[in-house]
Amino acid sequence: MEVIILPDPGRIGSLAADAITALITRKPDAVLGLATGSSPLAVYDELVSRYEAGQISFRQARGFTLDEYVGLPADHPERYRNVIDTAFAARVDFAPGAVQGPDGLADDIPAACAAYEAAIRDAGGVDLQILGIGTDGHIAFNEPGSSLASRTRIKTLTRQTRVDNARFFGGDLDQVPTHCLTQGLGTIMEARHLILIAMGRSKAEAVHHLVEGAVSAMWPATVLQMHPHVTVLLDDAAAQRLQLVDYYRETYRAKPAWQGI
Protein backbone atom coordinates (compact mmCIF):
# COMPACT_ATOMS: atom_id res chain seq x y z
CA MET A 1 0.00 0.00 0.00
CA GLU A 2 1.43 3.35 -1.07
CA VAL A 3 0.26 6.41 0.88
CA ILE A 4 0.65 9.79 -0.82
CA ILE A 5 -0.26 13.01 0.99
CA LEU A 6 -0.89 16.08 -1.16
CA PRO A 7 -1.97 19.61 -0.25
CA ASP A 8 -5.16 20.06 -2.26
CA PRO A 9 -7.83 18.29 -4.35
CA GLY A 10 -6.34 19.57 -7.58
CA ARG A 11 -3.03 17.81 -6.97
CA ILE A 12 -4.82 14.64 -5.92
CA GLY A 13 -7.03 14.70 -8.99
CA SER A 14 -4.07 15.31 -11.29
CA LEU A 15 -2.03 12.42 -9.88
CA ALA A 16 -4.92 9.96 -10.15
CA ALA A 17 -5.63 11.21 -13.67
CA ASP A 18 -1.97 10.62 -14.55
CA ALA A 19 -2.38 6.94 -13.63
CA ILE A 20 -5.56 6.61 -15.70
CA THR A 21 -3.99 8.45 -18.65
CA ALA A 22 -0.97 6.14 -18.56
CA LEU A 23 -3.27 3.10 -18.44
CA ILE A 24 -5.42 4.25 -21.37
CA THR A 25 -2.31 5.13 -23.39
CA ARG A 26 -0.87 1.63 -23.11
CA LYS A 27 -4.24 -0.15 -23.12
CA PRO A 28 -6.95 1.85 -24.94
CA ASP A 29 -9.61 -0.77 -24.14
CA ALA A 30 -8.93 -0.64 -20.40
CA VAL A 31 -11.70 -1.37 -17.91
CA LEU A 32 -12.19 1.37 -15.31
CA GLY A 33 -13.98 1.06 -12.00
CA LEU A 34 -15.89 4.27 -11.32
CA ALA A 35 -16.88 5.57 -7.89
CA THR A 36 -19.45 8.21 -7.00
CA GLY A 37 -19.34 10.67 -4.11
CA SER A 38 -17.34 13.86 -3.72
CA SER A 39 -13.86 12.29 -3.46
CA PRO A 40 -13.37 11.37 -7.15
CA LEU A 41 -14.77 14.60 -8.62
CA ALA A 42 -11.38 16.27 -8.99
CA VAL A 43 -10.17 13.19 -10.88
CA TYR A 44 -13.11 13.25 -13.26
CA ASP A 45 -12.77 17.00 -13.87
CA GLU A 46 -9.09 16.58 -14.71
CA LEU A 47 -9.82 13.69 -17.08
CA VAL A 48 -12.51 15.74 -18.82
CA SER A 49 -10.02 18.60 -19.25
CA ARG A 50 -7.50 16.23 -20.79
CA TYR A 51 -10.15 14.76 -23.08
CA GLU A 52 -11.19 18.23 -24.24
CA ALA A 53 -7.52 19.02 -24.92
CA GLY A 54 -7.21 15.90 -27.06
CA GLN A 55 -4.84 14.19 -24.64
CA ILE A 56 -6.97 11.12 -23.90
CA SER A 57 -9.87 9.20 -25.42
CA PHE A 58 -12.22 6.68 -23.83
CA ARG A 59 -13.69 5.41 -27.13
CA GLN A 60 -12.48 1.87 -26.55
CA ALA A 61 -12.60 1.86 -22.75
CA ARG A 62 -15.29 0.38 -20.53
CA GLY A 63 -16.50 1.35 -17.09
CA PHE A 64 -18.26 -0.33 -14.18
CA THR A 65 -19.77 1.54 -11.26
CA LEU A 66 -19.39 0.24 -7.73
CA ASP A 67 -22.94 0.37 -6.48
CA GLU A 68 -26.52 1.55 -6.92
CA TYR A 69 -29.48 2.46 -4.75
CA VAL A 70 -32.40 0.05 -4.86
CA GLY A 71 -35.71 1.49 -5.98
CA LEU A 72 -34.75 4.94 -7.27
CA PRO A 73 -36.51 5.73 -10.57
CA ALA A 74 -34.36 5.48 -13.69
CA ASP A 75 -34.46 9.26 -14.17
CA HIS A 76 -33.69 10.16 -10.54
CA PRO A 77 -30.67 12.53 -10.42
CA GLU A 78 -29.16 10.61 -7.48
CA ARG A 79 -29.35 7.23 -9.18
CA TYR A 80 -25.66 6.41 -9.34
CA ARG A 81 -25.69 5.52 -13.01
CA ASN A 82 -26.96 9.05 -13.67
CA VAL A 83 -24.49 10.58 -11.21
CA ILE A 84 -21.59 8.97 -13.06
CA ASP A 85 -22.92 10.27 -16.38
CA THR A 86 -23.22 13.80 -15.01
CA ALA A 87 -19.83 13.79 -13.30
CA PHE A 88 -17.82 12.02 -15.97
CA ALA A 89 -19.08 9.47 -18.49
CA ALA A 90 -21.34 11.74 -20.56
CA ARG A 91 -18.64 14.43 -20.65
CA VAL A 92 -16.16 12.26 -22.55
CA ASP A 93 -16.39 9.82 -25.46
CA PHE A 94 -17.32 6.45 -23.98
CA ALA A 95 -19.20 4.38 -26.54
CA PRO A 96 -22.95 3.87 -25.89
CA GLY A 97 -23.42 1.14 -23.32
CA ALA A 98 -19.74 1.06 -22.37
CA VAL A 99 -20.43 2.15 -18.79
CA GLN A 100 -22.55 -0.22 -16.71
CA GLY A 101 -23.93 -0.27 -13.19
CA PRO A 102 -25.85 -2.72 -11.02
CA ASP A 103 -29.59 -2.80 -11.77
CA GLY A 104 -31.30 -1.35 -8.72
CA LEU A 105 -34.72 -1.73 -10.37
CA ALA A 106 -34.43 -5.43 -11.18
CA ASP A 107 -37.33 -7.72 -10.27
CA ASP A 108 -34.86 -10.50 -9.46
CA ILE A 109 -32.14 -8.90 -7.35
CA PRO A 110 -29.95 -12.00 -6.87
CA ALA A 111 -29.99 -12.65 -10.62
CA ALA A 112 -29.09 -9.01 -11.31
CA CYS A 113 -26.14 -9.25 -8.92
CA ALA A 114 -24.91 -12.45 -10.55
CA ALA A 115 -25.27 -10.87 -13.98
CA TYR A 116 -23.18 -7.88 -12.89
CA GLU A 117 -20.42 -10.13 -11.61
CA ALA A 118 -20.51 -11.98 -14.94
CA ALA A 119 -20.32 -8.72 -16.91
CA ILE A 120 -17.19 -7.63 -15.05
CA ARG A 121 -15.64 -11.05 -15.53
CA ASP A 122 -16.52 -11.14 -19.24
CA ALA A 123 -14.90 -7.72 -19.71
CA GLY A 124 -11.64 -9.17 -18.42
CA GLY A 125 -11.87 -7.67 -14.95
CA VAL A 126 -11.25 -4.12 -13.77
CA ASP A 127 -7.82 -2.68 -14.58
CA LEU A 128 -8.04 0.37 -12.31
CA GLN A 129 -10.66 1.00 -9.65
CA ILE A 130 -11.29 4.42 -8.10
CA LEU A 131 -12.52 4.26 -4.50
CA GLY A 132 -13.64 6.58 -1.75
CA ILE A 133 -14.04 5.70 1.91
CA GLY A 134 -16.88 6.34 4.34
CA THR A 135 -16.46 7.81 7.80
CA ASP A 136 -17.11 4.33 9.19
CA GLY A 137 -14.59 2.70 6.86
CA HIS A 138 -17.00 1.40 4.25
CA ILE A 139 -15.94 1.14 0.61
CA ALA A 140 -18.61 1.02 -2.06
CA PHE A 141 -21.60 0.13 0.15
CA ASN A 142 -19.81 -2.59 2.09
CA GLU A 143 -20.85 -1.49 5.56
CA PRO A 144 -19.10 -2.50 8.80
CA GLY A 145 -19.51 -6.22 9.36
CA SER A 146 -19.37 -7.06 5.65
CA SER A 147 -17.63 -10.27 4.69
CA LEU A 148 -14.13 -9.62 3.42
CA ALA A 149 -14.81 -12.19 0.67
CA SER A 150 -18.23 -10.79 -0.32
CA ARG A 151 -19.51 -10.51 -3.89
CA THR A 152 -22.05 -8.19 -5.54
CA ARG A 153 -25.24 -8.32 -3.46
CA ILE A 154 -28.00 -6.31 -1.80
CA LYS A 155 -27.11 -4.48 1.42
CA THR A 156 -29.01 -2.51 4.03
CA LEU A 157 -27.42 0.90 4.55
CA THR A 158 -26.43 1.96 8.05
CA ARG A 159 -28.02 5.05 9.50
CA GLN A 160 -24.60 6.75 9.45
CA THR A 161 -24.22 6.20 5.72
CA ARG A 162 -27.72 7.50 5.09
CA VAL A 163 -27.02 10.57 7.24
CA ASP A 164 -23.77 11.17 5.35
CA ASN A 165 -25.58 10.88 2.00
CA ALA A 166 -28.61 12.96 2.95
CA ARG A 167 -26.80 16.05 1.64
CA PHE A 168 -27.39 14.69 -1.86
CA PHE A 169 -31.14 14.45 -1.14
CA GLY A 170 -31.71 17.99 0.06
CA GLY A 171 -30.80 17.05 3.62
CA ASP A 172 -33.93 14.87 3.92
CA LEU A 173 -32.95 11.54 5.49
CA ASP A 174 -36.32 10.04 4.60
CA GLN A 175 -35.51 10.42 0.90
CA VAL A 176 -32.31 8.36 1.16
CA PRO A 177 -32.95 4.72 0.19
CA THR A 178 -32.43 2.06 2.83
CA HIS A 179 -31.03 -0.57 0.44
CA CYS A 180 -28.44 -0.75 -2.29
CA LEU A 181 -26.66 -3.14 -4.61
CA THR A 182 -22.90 -3.10 -4.21
CA GLN A 183 -19.84 -4.83 -5.50
CA GLY A 184 -18.49 -6.97 -2.68
CA LEU A 185 -15.12 -6.61 -1.04
CA GLY A 186 -14.00 -9.78 -2.79
CA THR A 187 -15.13 -8.32 -6.12
CA ILE A 188 -13.28 -5.04 -5.54
CA MET A 189 -10.12 -6.87 -4.51
CA GLU A 190 -9.95 -8.51 -7.94
CA ALA A 191 -9.26 -5.16 -9.65
CA ARG A 192 -5.62 -4.94 -10.68
CA HIS A 193 -4.93 -1.45 -9.30
CA LEU A 194 -6.92 0.33 -6.60
CA ILE A 195 -6.72 4.10 -6.07
CA LEU A 196 -8.49 5.25 -2.90
CA ILE A 197 -9.04 8.96 -2.37
CA ALA A 198 -9.88 10.52 1.00
CA MET A 199 -10.06 14.19 1.88
CA GLY A 200 -11.15 16.09 4.95
CA ARG A 201 -10.92 15.70 8.70
CA SER A 202 -14.07 13.57 8.86
CA LYS A 203 -12.20 10.77 7.04
CA ALA A 204 -9.14 10.79 9.34
CA GLU A 205 -10.30 8.00 11.67
CA ALA A 206 -11.27 5.71 8.81
CA VAL A 207 -7.96 6.42 7.05
CA HIS A 208 -6.07 5.58 10.25
CA HIS A 209 -7.72 2.16 10.37
CA LEU A 210 -7.34 1.63 6.60
CA VAL A 211 -3.59 2.22 6.59
CA GLU A 212 -2.37 1.36 10.08
CA GLY A 213 -5.11 -0.66 11.76
CA ALA A 214 -5.80 -4.37 11.97
CA VAL A 215 -7.67 -6.03 9.11
CA SER A 216 -11.25 -6.33 10.33
CA ALA A 217 -14.76 -6.57 8.94
CA MET A 218 -15.67 -3.76 11.33
CA TRP A 219 -13.54 -1.45 9.17
CA PRO A 220 -14.18 -2.93 5.71
CA ALA A 221 -11.58 -0.83 3.89
CA THR A 222 -8.81 -2.53 5.88
CA VAL A 223 -9.08 -5.51 3.52
CA LEU A 224 -7.17 -3.36 1.02
CA GLN A 225 -4.02 -4.01 3.06
CA MET A 226 -4.05 -7.47 1.47
CA HIS A 227 -4.06 -6.14 -2.12
CA PRO A 228 -0.75 -6.06 -4.05
CA HIS A 229 -1.29 -2.66 -5.71
CA VAL A 230 -3.13 0.00 -3.72
CA THR A 231 -2.50 3.75 -3.89
CA VAL A 232 -4.02 5.90 -1.13
CA LEU A 233 -4.25 9.61 -1.99
CA LEU A 234 -4.89 11.90 0.98
CA ASP A 235 -4.99 15.56 1.86
CA ASP A 236 -3.42 16.81 5.08
CA ALA A 237 -6.68 16.70 7.02
CA ALA A 238 -7.44 13.09 6.15
CA ALA A 239 -3.87 12.08 7.06
CA GLN A 240 -3.77 13.72 10.48
CA ARG A 241 -4.30 10.51 12.51
CA LEU A 242 -1.54 8.53 10.80
CA GLN A 243 1.36 7.62 13.06
CA LEU A 244 3.84 7.27 10.21
CA VAL A 245 2.82 10.43 8.38
CA ASP A 246 6.39 11.78 8.19
CA TYR A 247 7.61 8.51 6.70
CA TYR A 248 4.87 8.53 4.05
CA ARG A 249 5.87 12.05 3.05
CA GLU A 250 9.56 11.13 2.91
CA THR A 251 9.02 8.04 0.78
CA TYR A 252 6.95 9.95 -1.77
CA ARG A 253 9.50 12.77 -1.99
CA ALA A 254 12.23 10.20 -2.65
CA LYS A 255 10.22 8.23 -5.21
CA PRO A 256 11.74 8.02 -8.73
CA ALA A 257 9.62 9.84 -11.31
CA TRP A 258 9.65 6.84 -13.65
CA GLN A 259 7.87 4.66 -11.10
CA GLY A 260 4.43 6.28 -11.39
CA ILE A 261 1.77 5.12 -8.95
Curated annotation (Swiss-Prot):
It catalyses: alpha-D-glucosamine 6-phosphate + H2O = beta-D-fructose 6-phosphate + NH4(+). GO terms for cellular component: cytoplasm. One of its GO terms (biological process) is glucosamine catabolic process. Pathway: Amino-sugar metabolism; N-acetylneuraminate degradation; D-fructose 6-phosphate from N-acetylneuraminate: step 5/5. Its EC number is 3.5.99.6. The keyword Ribosomal protein does not apply. Transmembrane segments: none annotated. GO terms for molecular function: glucosamine-6-phosphate deaminase activity; identical protein binding. Keywords: Carbohydrate metabolism, Hydrolase. The keyword Hydrolase applies. InterPro entries: Glc/Gal-6P_isomerase (IPR006148), Glucosamine6P_isomerase (IPR004547), Glucosamine6P_isomerase_CS (IPR018321), NagB/RpiA_transferase-like (IPR037171). The active site is at residues 67, 136, 138, 143. Catalyzes the reversible isomerization-deamination of glucosamine 6-phosphate (GlcN6P) to form fructose 6-phosphate (Fru6P) and ammonium ion. This is Glucosamine-6-phosphate deaminase. It comes from Mycolicibacterium smegmatis (strain ATCC 700084 / mc(2)155).
